[in-house]
Amino acid sequence: MRVLSIIPARGGSKGINLKNLVILNQKPLLYYTVMASLESKIINKTVVSTDNKKIGKTALELGAEVVYRPKKLATDTAQLEPVVDHVLAHLEEYQDYNPEIIVILQNTSPLRTAKHIDEALTLMKKKKYDSILSGFSIHTFLWKQFKNSIKPSDYDPKRRPIRQKSGEQLFENGAIFATKTKCFIKSRCRISGKIGFYVMPLEKSYNIDSQKDLKAIRKFLKN
C-alpha cells in the first residue's frame, strides 16, 4: 500500500523565528518529525512541504523528499488542505505517484514517534476508519461560558459523580492526521467519513507554538 506522509514546514512563524529549525536537544525541530516518519514501518514515502531553502536543505539531509510550495501557500492564513493538494499534484505530475493513504505530521509535535504513527495507522486499518487523528483523553467535567455565568456541559452538579466515573473527554493534539486519499479528494478535508481517534499519552502531546512552549519541552526533555 502506498502511504505518504506530508510534513508541512513553512519558513515563517509568528511565535518563533524559523521555528522548524529551532534547536531542541541538539537537533533541529524538523528532525523529530522527519525521523518518526522515516522510521515508521507503514509509511513508505516522506515529503516535506516548504517555501524555505534552509528547511528544504535540512529535510534532504535528513532523508526526506522536498516539495517547494509557492509563497501564497506559506502565509499565516494559508490553510493546510491546499498544501496537501499541491504536494499531491506535484507527485502525480513529476513522479506519477498517487498515494492510497495520506498522513499529515506537524513539526510542532516532536514527542510523537514512529510507534505512535504505526499504532494509529494500524488502528485505522483494523477498525476500517476513513480517517484518524491523535489526541489524549481525560476524565473531567466540562463547562461552557455564557454571557454572565458558566454552566456545566455534561453533568448535573447536584448529582456530581466521582471524577473517575465522569465522561471521558477527547482532546485533539495535532500530532497525527491520516486519511484515505479518496476521502480527502471528495471532502477537501484532512479528516472525513468514519473518523477514528488514537489516544496518545498526555506527556507525549506537547505542542510547540511559542517560546513558552519551547522552554517547557526543553525542561521536560532535560528531566
Predicted regions and their residues:
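Short phosphate-binding loop-to-helix
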Residues: K53-V103, R112-K115, E119-T122
